[in-house]
Amino acid sequence: MELTELLLVVMLLLTARLTLSSPAPPACDLRVLSKLLRDSHVLHSRLSQCPEVHPLPTPVLLPAVDFSLGEWKTQMEETKAQDILGAVTLLLEGVMAARGQLGPTCLSSLLGQLSGQVRLLLGALQSLLGTQLPPQGRTTAHKDPNAIFLSFQHLLRGKVRFLMLVGGSTLCVRRAPPTTAVPSRTSLVLTLNELPNRTSGLLETNFTASARTTGSGLLKWQQGFRAKIPGLLNQTSRSLDQIPGYLNRIHELLNGTRGLFPGPSRRTLGAPDISSGTSDTGSLPPNLQPGYSPSPTHPPTGQYTLFPLPPTLPTPVVQLHPLLPDPSAPTPTPTSPLLNTSYTHSQNLSQEG
């Protein structure tokens, strides 16, 4: 949704800029005239690279581009405009007439490019001076192709340039469209209705509230987006805070404190496996010998305790009786479950023998 809102705001800004701006005619920009003059020089220089340039079979009529500056200043603006429009129109007709006399040659290609530049100049002047029918001016006949390119250059440097430098500012202000004032409060819905029908439905659905200006709407959107950033950061921090809890659970499961394992195995403590039925206590390691009391503070070498051991209590020393007692000896009285079990087992063996 944020991307859609951003695109709509950009569209509104572009629409407002196109509506409020008053584009001046191309002729009011002197860079256009400078570019046309540079391009005409480039075309004229390429003419010398053509292999064969012959005079035209039939002379063409070209406008008279020479003028007197003093006489030019005394003329009215309308007379100057009609004179320039007539000269450019005659030049375009002369270029097309000269090209029609040639076949597909290098000169014909250059004349085609020159006609495009003349059309561009004529369109720019008509947007500034109007499209009234210009009167016929003075003309001269020429057969030399170089005269066509030179006429265009002299026209740009002379009459057109002086027209724009002297009275161009007045003409540009007169021909510029009036600017429309922007109301202090503009509804976004009303502005969006002026857009094409494809986007009007989407814009009316997404935006039902009005804003004062398009700039304030963009500012509110940025503030709303910034307000969402702390919430995203809080969610991330909460997720990070849950990680230690999962680690503690895993640690407890591995240590066997959840009831999954009764305790550390003999392999964990380093004790070897003892097969069932083996009663040789001499082969047992020291930590499994009867009467061995491990130190809670100093475990044996190579062994580690996972949890602190409780305080050691005095362990009674248990003496094992032989499996086959002497029948003449008095029967001992068992004092513990372990002695009782060994005594019963010895009696069973003696009866079987």
From Swiss-Prot:
Annotated consequence of substituting residue 99 to W: In THC9 and CAMT2; likely pathogenic; results in reduced protein secretion
Ranges of Pro residues composition bias in the record: 324-335
GO biological process, one term: positive regulation of megakaryocyte differentiation
Keywords of this entry: Cytokine, Disease variant, Disulfide bond, Glycoprotein, Hormone, Secreted, Signal
Any one GO molecular function term: signaling receptor binding
Biased composition (Polar residues): 275-304, 343-353
Compartments, record wording: Secreted
One of the record's GO cellular component terms: extracellular region
Region called Disordered, residue ranges: 257-353
Record-annotated disulphide pairs: 28-172, 50-106
Presence of keyword Signal: yes
Signal peptide range in chain numbering: 1-21
Entries under Pfam families matching the protein: EPO_TPO
Cell division as UniProt keyword: no
Its biological purpose: Lineage-specific cytokine affecting the proliferation and maturation of megakaryocytes from their committed progenitor cells. It acts at a late stage of megakaryocyte development. It may be the major physiological regulator of circulating platelets.
Pathological association: Thrombocythemia 1: A myeloproliferative disorder characterized by excessive platelet production, resulting in increased numbers of circulating platelets. It can be associated with spontaneous hemorrhages and thrombotic episodes.
Assembly and oligomerization: Interacts with MPL/TPOR.
Protein's UniProt name: Thrombopoietin
Origin species: Homo sapiens
